[in-house]
């Protein structure tokens, strides 16, 4: 029985990657397209003046992008994790591994995650677990990678679509609070592509969580992945569940939103998307599916070159926004239009204030 469970988990990991890459071949319209920065025609700064450094859970990093959790737990994904670790090392960006539950249940899979630290010995690495994982097991996940931080992913929609997924969730908040109090490294609570509302963020802030990853709809769709894995595909009605990254970011502009650090991920496609997310308060921006897609189609070297180009392009966008650093970018005026503006108005977000901030 244990062997069958292990094989099922390994197959699931491989299917996640294959289906995730397929999704990224043709991207749907993004809610971030409804966000427009108000720039300048007479910049105050030169490109060389721009400072892209940011802080993630107390660690200073030189560029506001990280490789978000996606994979690990099978022979095939070990190779992918090794290549992602090389990209993270050469581009000097943090990296999160995929859920480590497989390795916690089957020690023969530990190396599929540990390879990340072997290839990137000095980089910022985030371990990744579910709130189903008991504290002592979670500490093993941190040790496995000598991790700098711990991601706890919350994914009820994915679990419900997954035939072998969890069906009990009421203990999650207590478990997360336990990690916040006892983890030897900082904790980031992240969604997996269904987005966090400000109410969810407040619930987490109330138990001591200091950083969340809003992880909205628009990137890899795990409801679709799990539904595609089912023979009956019985959950096709749930494929559009959740809020987009743009909606999650706008929701955090409400006057009652908790004042904690947040990261943004889900449907980030280019440097302009990064700038928009940072301008709406994110400290850094995560990508998973698009980086794996680039890796699969173009290889490690081309993906690193793309990220280096993005750094230069990002500096140019900061110049156009009249912002020397991320702190200044967060005061840049923004116009919210289209469906995102309608959604924001219904959520009582002061869009006029956003459009006229200084």
UniProtKB/Swiss-Prot annotation:
<dbReference type="GO" id="GO:0008299">
    <property type="term" value="P:isoprenoid biosynthetic process"/>
</dbReference>
<feature type="binding site">
    <location>
        <begin position="267"/>
        <end position="269"/>
    </location>
    <ligand>
        <name>FMN</name>
    </ligand>
</feature>
<keyword id="KW-0414">Isoprene biosynthesis</keyword>
<dbReference type="GO" id="GO:0016491">
    <property type="term" value="F:oxidoreductase activity"/>
</dbReference>
<dbReference type="GO" id="GO:0010181">
    <property type="term" value="F:FMN binding"/>
</dbReference>
<keyword id="KW-0288">FMN</keyword>
<keyword id="KW-0521">NADP</keyword>
<keyword id="KW-0479">Metal-binding</keyword>
<feature type="binding site">
    <location>
        <begin position="288"/>
        <end position="289"/>
    </location>
    <ligand>
        <name>FMN</name>
    </ligand>
</feature>
<feature type="binding site">
    <location>
        <begin position="69"/>
        <end position="71"/>
    </location>
    <ligand>
        <name>FMN</name>
    </ligand>
</feature>
<comment type="subunit">
    <text>Homooctamer. Dimer of tetramers.</text>
</comment>
<keyword id="KW-0413">Isomerase</keyword>
<dbReference type="GO" id="GO:0000287">
    <property type="term" value="F:magnesium ion binding"/>
</dbReference>
<keyword id="KW-0963">Cytoplasm</keyword>
<keyword id="KW-0285">Flavoprotein</keyword>
<feature type="binding site">
    <location>
        <position position="220"/>
    </location>
    <ligand>
        <name>FMN</name>
    </ligand>
</feature>
<protein>
    <recommendedName>
        <fullName>Isopentenyl-diphosphate delta-isomerase</fullName>
        <ecNumber>5.3.3.2</ecNumber>
    </recommendedName>
</protein>
<comment type="function">
    <text>Involved in the biosynthesis of isoprenoids. Catalyzes the 1,3-allylic rearrangement of the homoallylic substrate isopentenyl (IPP) to its allylic isomer, dimethylallyl diphosphate (DMAPP).</text>
</comment>
<keyword id="KW-0460">Magnesium</keyword>
<feature type="binding site">
    <location>
        <position position="128"/>
    </location>
    <ligand>
        <name>FMN</name>
    </ligand>
</feature>
<dbReference type="InterPro" id="IPR013785">
    <property type="entry name" value="Aldolase_TIM"/>
</dbReference>
<dbReference type="Pfam" id="PF01070">
    <property type="entry name" value="FMN_dh"/>
</dbReference>
<feature type="binding site">
    <location>
        <begin position="12"/>
        <end position="13"/>
    </location>
    <ligand>
        <name>substrate</name>
    </ligand>
</feature>
<feature type="binding site">
    <location>
        <position position="190"/>
    </location>
    <ligand>
        <name>FMN</name>
    </ligand>
</feature>
<feature type="binding site">
    <location>
        <position position="158"/>
    </location>
    <ligand>
        <name>substrate</name>
    </ligand>
</feature>
<feature type="binding site">
    <location>
        <position position="159"/>
    </location>
    <ligand>
        <name>Mg(2+)</name>
    </ligand>
</feature>
<comment type="similarity">
    <text>Belongs to the IPP isomerase type 2 family.</text>
</comment>
<dbReference type="GO" id="GO:0005737">
    <property type="term" value="C:cytoplasm"/>
</dbReference>
<dbReference type="InterPro" id="IPR000262">
    <property type="entry name" value="FMN-dep_DH"/>
</dbReference>
<dbReference type="GO" id="GO:0070402">
    <property type="term" value="F:NADPH binding"/>
</dbReference>
<dbReference type="GO" id="GO:0004452">
    <property type="term" value="F:isopentenyl-diphosphate delta-isomerase activity"/>
</dbReference>
<feature type="binding site">
    <location>
        <position position="99"/>
    </location>
    <ligand>
        <name>FMN</name>
    </ligand>
</feature>
<dbReference type="InterPro" id="IPR011179">
    <property type="entry name" value="IPdP_isomerase"/>
</dbReference>
